[in-house]
Amino acid sequence: MNLPASIPVRTFISGCHILHRHHVLDAYGHLSVRNPERSDTFFMSRDLAPGLISSSVDLVEYFVHDASPVNPASPAGYIERFIHSEIYQKYPEVQSVVHSHASTVLPYTITGVNLRPCVHMSGFLGASVPNFDVAKFYKEDDKCDLLIRNKDLGAHLAECFSAPESDSESTRSVVLMRGHGFTAVGGSIPESVYRAIYTVENAKIQTVSMTLSAAAAKGDGPHSGIYFLPEHEIRGTKELTQRSVMRSWKLWVREVETGGLYTNLA
């Protein structure tokens, strides 16, 4: 695919590689970016493991309104591209989307335990992260396999990104998906990648903290539970990470460029 210079192909490919290197994506999951030249289309890779994407040939352009390929002769794409199209349709400020099946986050989608920000790098999670259950929206002819296979299911998922009226932001950064994974959004590829990575990191930290807290509760020493970020620290740390995301991004790009596994010909 011959793309205009304004399309961030190299950044997109680096983002896919970074997400794979950090175990946010494996053979499955995907990254997308809105077309900076026309907001009614977006780009994803063809049906390929993220770590193997290497050039613009691997990209497919889709219409936002129905997730159909702009070029009908495009190679096969991901089934769940409706996750991305419906988020772009509803939230014009969103420029990039990540969908992940990370195993460290999955327990928070099936246990009733809320994923909450507990470190300064994850204030973007907000006071609580909603958990979307696709089973509530199946129609009679839908495949009941948890995948977002059509526009209707994608639209229901997208609704979960609408923040409460009390929130200063109009869009949530992350939504969990019951038994499936999570989806993160951002105003750029680096921001959505950062949020996906630190969603996984926060889940790791919270899980270990809950284990230690449970052990402490059984002992003789003092026990005060887990200290999650209060509202004012959530706001402050979210602003902090929005300003500093490129520091992480530049390091991550260098790591995948020198890692040996990945190829970026863009």
From Swiss-Prot:
Cofactor field: Zn(2+)
Cofactor binding note from Swiss-Prot or TrEMBL: Binds 1 zinc ion per subunit.
The protein's annotated pathway: Secondary metabolite biosynthesis
Superkingdom assignment: Eukaryota
Group of enzyme by EC: oxidoreductase
Family matches, as SMART domains: Aldolase_II (SM01007)
Gene Ontology CC annotation, any one: cytoskeleton
Zinc as UniProt keyword: yes
Pfam families per record: Aldolase_II
SUPFAM superfamilies: AraD/HMP-PK domain-like (SSF53639)
Enzyme Commission code: 1.-.-.-
Entry-linked Gene3D superfamilies: Class II aldolase/adducin N-terminal domain (3.40.225.10)
Gene Ontology molecular function: actin filament binding; metal ion binding; oxidoreductase activity
Name the record gives this protein: Decarboxylase tropJ
Family the UniProt entry places it in: Belongs to the aldolase class II family.
Binding residues annotated for Zn(2+), in chain numbering: 80, 99, 101, 180
Entry keywords, A to Z: Metal-binding, Oxidoreductase, Zinc
Residues at the catalytic site: 80 (proton acceptor)
Keyword Metal-binding attributed: yes
Function (record text): Decarboxylase; part of the gene cluster that mediates the biosynthesis of the tropolone class of fungal maleic anhydrides. The pathway begins with the synthesis of 3-methylorcinaldehyde by the non-reducing polyketide synthase (PKS) tropA. 3-methylorcinaldehyde is the substrate for the FAD-dependent monooxygenase tropB to yield a dearomatized hydroxycyclohexadione. The 2-oxoglutarate-dependent dioxygenase tropC then performs the oxidative ring expansion to provide the first tropolone metabolite stipitaldehyde.
